[in-house]
Structures are given as structure tokens and as C-alpha cells.
Amino acid sequence: MQGANLKVLPSTRAAAKELVDPLDITNVGWSTLEPKFDELMQLMDAPSSGINALAARSAHREKVGAVIEQLLTRAQDESRRLLVEGNGEAAAEAGVKTLRLKERFYGKGSVKLVPAHFHLARTNQFLKRYGNAEEILSLAHFIILQNPDEADATIKAELHQTFGLLYAADNKLDVSVKHLTCATYYLSVMNGPEHVLTTFAYFDLANVFATKACMEAAMALYDTVKNIWLKHLRRVLKDIVDETMAAKLVKRYDDDEVTHEVGHASARAFGKENLADVSKMLFGIFSIQKERLTISHPTTARAQFLLGLYLLWVNKNDEAAEHLLSARTTSQKFYGERHPIVQDIEDWCIWFEIPFRGVAAEQ
């Protein structure tokens, strides 16, 4: 009967209990994280019997161990989410709990602990506890030095980047430059010096130079970021244009709507966190160059053109149109209406159906 409360007999209740999967971590929260971890650790060490007991025990340990790793990864991700949302104290508490469980599972000297140290360092930096953050990063550095064969360029790049941003926040700019330079080197080794992921290091380094009032060095690095991203965005946007044109050629009916949605898969594949960082970086460069050089400068126009292309990539065409039209107006005034730079901006407007003829962007 709908809405009625059903009574469960003891035998049925026991049977239902037996159906609970001990490896299920779907509904584990912070209050049940440690008890579930203890349960899984005991389960992993449970003895096996029968034929091929040794092989069965090994397979069992591997299976349960994989679940524990998933549980710890989820805890680390949740700790990071708390920090992103600005809840520093909760992120610190969650980070400490996660680190302690990782120490029990991996051992206190394992490289697998380093991401937890990075999180706690960033959390303490957010809370302006710079001394604590430096101490935590020093522990991470010691673990990396103790495990040279397991510490790859990725973890070294993150170590130096985290150190560099910490020292920048603490106004220790010279040592910040040293660490961010090391981070740039490792990212270049991993991805190449002209890869879009390496631009994050260039941007961090440029910001420190700007804080030190070394504006020539800062502007040179900002322009390096712009050049790398312009090359990348031209390529991925050209793919989107080509896909759209191909779709128009094969559409069956005149009233079919052809959009750019398919091509934007490259933006989605880049990841939400990376896209958020890129947005912050490109808007930051535009704002800095607008403030230093004014909106009418061709360098600022190039930054605004780049920002427009990025917004096209993430499918924010209305916002992109504002920046592209403004960049076109500035470029027309500086170079002339028939200059290749102006023509380039107009080509992208045509390809993405942004009207520009007779449009004057506000300066």
C-alpha cells in the first residue's frame, strides 16, 4: 500500500544487512570517513583460505586497496573544493584529516603524501599563516628529495610554483622569482616552452615582476603568454569553423540549424579548472595593459582581441563580440582600416557571424 510503513522481520533485516557492499563508498561523508577507512583497512588485512589462498589474498588486497585510494582521492578533492569556495578553516581541517589517513595507508615518507601537503600549504597561505605554509612545503620538499626516482617533473613544478606563490603573497619577491623560474623550467621540460600549460608559470612570474616594478620584464612575459594563446586559439577555432562549414554543406534541409557546439569539445576537454585559470589570466593581462597603456594602445587591442577569441572558444559569443569590436576599432585607428591586423579581426567576426560593418565600439 502506498504511503504505508512496512514492518521488517529480523530475518529480512539481517538479509538486507548482508547485501550491503562493504566496498561501497558512495555515501561516505566527513563524519564517516575515518570509520569507513578503518573498516576498509581491516577488510584489506582479512585472511584468505582454501586453494591458492596466497593469490586470492593478493587479489583481495589489491581490490580493497584500490577502493581506499578512491576514498582518499575523493577526500582530497573535497578538501580542495572547500578551499576554492573560500572556506579556509574547513579546508584546513579536512586537509589535516586526509593527510593523516594517507600517512596510515601509504607511509609517512611516501610521495603520495605530497599533494596533501600542497593543499595544506595553499590553505595556510589563504589564511595568511605564511610560516605554517612554508613549514608544510619544506616537509613536502624533503619527501621529494628522499624519493628522487618517484618525483617527476610534474610534482617538482608544482612544488616550486606553490613556493613561489607563497613567497609572493608574503612579499618575499626575490625568492619568489627564483622558485617561479624553477617552476617555469620544469613546465617547459614537461610540455614545451610554447605550450599553453606553460603560460601559467609565465603569468605568475610576470605578476611578481610587476609587483617589483620591473614592468619591462612583466610586459614581455605577458606578451609571451598572449602569443602562445593566440597561436593555440587560432588553431582550435579554425577547427570549429571548418566543422561548422562542413555541417552546413551536408545539412538536409534549409531550416536546419547549424551551430558551433560540436567544435567546442576542445574547450570542455581542457577542463573547468584550467579554463577558469585561463579566463582569470587573460582578463588579468587585458586589465593590466589597459591600465598601464590605455585602451587605445595597440598592445591593449591585441590583448582584447585574444580575450575575444578565448570567449569564442568557450562559447560566450555575445561577450566575445564586445571585445572583438573594441579591438577592431582601436586597431583601425592605429593601423588603418585595410591593415592585415584589422582584416584578421574582421575575418573572425565573419566566421562567427558577428556583425561589424557600421559598428563603432565604445572606447
UniProtKB/Swiss-Prot annotation:
Phenotype reported upon loss of the gene:
RNAi-mediated knockdown results in reduced mobility due to defective flagellar beating.
InterPro entries xref list = TPR-like_helical_dom_sf, Zinc_finger_MYND_domain
Domain of life according to the entry: Eukaryota
Report the Gene3D superfamilies cross-referenced here: Tetratricopeptide repeat domain
**Locations listed in the record:** Cytoplasm, Cytoskeleton, Flagellum axoneme
Ranges where the record places region Required for localization to the flagellum and for flagellar motility: 129-363
Please list the residue ranges covered by the TPR repeats. 157-190, 199-232
Q: Which BP terms from GO are recorded?
A: cilium-dependent cell motility
Q: Name one GO cellular component term.
A: ciliary plasm
Could you confirm whether the keyword Cytoplasm appears in this record?
yes
Q: List UniProt keywords, sorted A-Z.
A: Cell projection, Cilium, Cytoplasm, Cytoskeleton, Flagellum, Repeat, TPR repeat
Oligomeric and partner information: Interacts with TTC29.
Q: Which PANTHER family match?
A: ZINC FINGER MYND DOMAIN-CONTAINING PROTEIN 12
Role, per record: Required for flagellum motility.
- Name used for this protein in its record: Protein TAX-1
**Organism encoding this protein:** Trypanosoma brucei brucei (strain 927/4 GUTat10.1)
